[in-house]
Design a protein with these regions (language model features):
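Basic, polyanion-binding surface patches
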Residues: 2-185
Length: 185
């Protein structure tokens, strides 16, 4: 998960005027944002027979009633295309010992529909058809209720239509800080 870089993007405080000051302020702002705690997930997506899994860290519960989950997906990602067209997604919470799995889903996914694997990881279709990794400690499955344009990403708000555990409820799940990965800022 690489962080996009480029020219600093505002807004900037009034005392930040020169290009050099903007660059330094942008670096500071990124370091602060990288301190925000994040989970690390594999989001599953489906449209018809097309399926995908993608490493994702921008996810949160946004409502109790109804139960809503929000995920932010980069617009040029294949997963974005599938969620937009299919209207569903799964959020797979991996156990901490599955660090290698999230690295596998940073790269393009090889789908074996006959063997029911994504990048070699077994999956089953959830109630909506979104893939749920068999290795996931827990998962939620959502139907998109409200996509929100957020610049380079879309924040998909989905209603939880199914959820479950595939490991003991006390299993520690993977977080960004458990790896050397970073995405944000």
């Amino acid at each position: 998960m690489a962080t996009k870089s480029g020219p600093p993007i505002g807004p900037f405080p009034p005392d930040v005027e020169t290009d050099e000051q903007k660059e330094e302020y942008d670096k500071l702002r990124r370091r602060v944002l990288w301190k925000m705690p994040y989970g690390l997930y594999v989001v599953g997506a489906r449209d018809g027979e097309r399926r995908n899994g993608m490493t994702l860290n921008w996810a949160t519960q946004v409502s109790f009633e109804p139960k809503l989950i929000g995920i932010s997906v980069e617009k040029d990602a294949f997963t974005h295309e599938l969620i937009t067209a299919g209207g569903v997604f799964s959020l797979n919470l991996l156990p901490q010992e599955e660090r290698a799995a999230v690295r596998k889903f940073v790269k393009p996914v090889v789908v074996d529909p006959d063997g029911k694997t994504l990048n070699g990881y077994a999956y089953h279709d959830g109630r909506t058809g979104a893939p749920i990794l068999d290795v996931a400690a827990a998962w939620v499955e959502c139907e998109v209720r409200n996509p929100v344009d957020c610049g380079g990403h879309t924040f998909f708000i989905g209603e939880v239509v199914d959820a479950g555990f595939q490991a003991d409820e006390e299993t520690a799940v993977l977080r960004m800080e458990d790896t050397r990965m970073s995405y944000g800022g």
